[in-house]
């Protein structure tokens, strides 16, 4: 068995989307703090991986390409090659048959930790049951770190998922925004009006009304940010709203990593819940997100505060004196529509008023 200060190798496996990966970052940092001379490798899908390159909590990003995702033979070969490096710890946050393959090829690894699932996980030597937790971050730390405490290590937990851009990258984006006409003397809002996942999109008509409200009340600079595949849809929405010098849809963020310097140049994030909201929290700007019916606010909004706000359809049950039985019979669209525009305006006001730029 290795000691706390030994040079050890750690592999953390976390597939899925941007939000899932971001909320796994505290686990990676906790491992580095607990084992100060460790090297932490982080396995991610290729569309998410660039965000974590050169991150101080991660030593090496291992990318699973789209071809490897789709082709089982290429995937198995990739996992086999990755595990030729001797790992002292493997933590499989995903704990699916696909991700467990990393442990199948690493039978001599001292700690092979996965989440407890019935009739699965035969190649983990620690199958951890879920514990009571505050949110996703808390859940991963409470569920996956206890084996080290039981082994006598002094476990250090960290709950932050910070992101930073270099001063050059930040300045580059500021220049880009200035050239587009953004007035930094006014509140600059990164506005998430669209999502590649259709059920996450709060009704566009109401969003348009919110945009107009924020401009009328605060003279806000509204920036519709998007990935390359969303450009046409975003510019269509902008055209429908009409020509307005306070709305910008030409400031592109070509890669996921570009979102970091872009958000660092904004004062607020407002709009649909998603990975970008987690990133806004990670760079430290005030954020207010509208959660769709399938996203549990308690899980996906770590450490809510005046600076990190959210609203979900469940929150409207009490406000509208709605019987739970009736709510449960509603379609997702009907549940989503329970979040009225007045509530969203009020919460947007609260975010802006309580987090004014100093």
Question: Could you say what each language-model-derived stretch is?
Answer:
Residues 1-358:
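Catalytic machinery of carbohydrate-active enzymes
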């Amino acid at each position: 068995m290795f000691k706390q200060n030994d040079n050890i190798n750690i592999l953390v496996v976390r597939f899925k989307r941007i939000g899932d990966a971001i909320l796994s970052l505290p686990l990676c940092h906790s491992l580095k703090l607990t084992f100060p001379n460790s090297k932490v490798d982080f396995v991610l899908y290729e569309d998410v991986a660039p965000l974590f390159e050169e991150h101080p909590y991660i030593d090496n990003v291992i990318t699973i390409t789209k071809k490897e995702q789709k082709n089982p033979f290429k995937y198995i070969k990739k996992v086999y090659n990755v595990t030729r490096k001797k790992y002292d710890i493997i933590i499989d946050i995903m704990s699916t048959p696909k991700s467990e393959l990393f442990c199948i090829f690493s039978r001599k690894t001292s700690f092979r930790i996965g989440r407890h699932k019935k009739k699965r996980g035969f190649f983990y030597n620690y199958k951890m049951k879920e514990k009571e937790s505050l949110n996703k971050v808390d859940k991963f730390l409470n569920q996956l770190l206890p084996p080290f405490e039981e082994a006598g290590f002094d476990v250090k937990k960290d709950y932050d998922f910070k992101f930073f851009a270099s001063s050059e990258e930040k300045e580059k984006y500021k220049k880009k925004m200035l050239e587009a006409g953004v007035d930094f003397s006014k509140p600059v809002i990164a506005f998430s009006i669209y999502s590649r996942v259709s059920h996450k999109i709060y009704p566009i008509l109401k969003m348009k009304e919110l945009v107009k409200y924020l401009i009328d009340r605060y003279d806000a600079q509204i920036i519709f940010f998007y990935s390359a595949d969303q450009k046409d849809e975003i510019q269509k929405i902008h055209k429908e709203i009409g020509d307005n010098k306070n709305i910008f849809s030409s400031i592109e963020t070509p890669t996921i990593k570009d979102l970091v310097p872009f958000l660092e140049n904004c004062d607020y994030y407002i709009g649909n819940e998603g990975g970008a909201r987690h990133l806004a929290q990670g760079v430290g700007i005030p954020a207010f997100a509208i959660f769709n019916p399938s996203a549990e606010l308690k899980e996906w909004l770590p450490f809510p505060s005046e600076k990190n706000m959210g609203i979900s359809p469940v929150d409207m049950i009490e406000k509208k004196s709605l019987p739970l039985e009736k709510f449960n019979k509603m379609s997702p669209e009907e549940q989503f529509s329970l979040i009225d525009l007045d509530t969203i305006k009020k919460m947007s006001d609260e975010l802006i008023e309580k987090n004014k730029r100093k």
